[in-house]
């Protein structure tokens, strides 16, 4: 990934807290924004933690991660965490994805 605009970067935690094939949720803006960061094949992905499939706002960080696909534990919707695209419904709206990088051991998100 190219260097991101430093003015817009937010450090969310240490890079070593996210092992491969694992998802970690982070709360930003006084818990108003939930973003998950996943590491797959040593690459980081950042996306909205809350599923778009309904009013329950189910956390995707508790779902099943298989490669770059994550499945909502509540309704079974599946998303591509690299693009945010819906792979399988009932969700119809994509996830918001964020640029993310590991800089000197710190995970930084452009959000």
List where the protein language model places each region.
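Short beta-strand-alpha-helix junction that forms the catalytic/metal-binding core
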Residues: 70-72
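N-terminal pre-ligand scaffold of iron-sulfur
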Residues: 1-67, 81, 97-111
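C-terminal structural segments of small proteins and small subunits
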Residues: 82-98
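Short Cys/His-rich metal-coordination motifs, predominantly Zn2+-binding knuckles/fingers
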Residues: 54, 74-75
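Glycine-rich His-Gly loop
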Residues: 49, 75-76
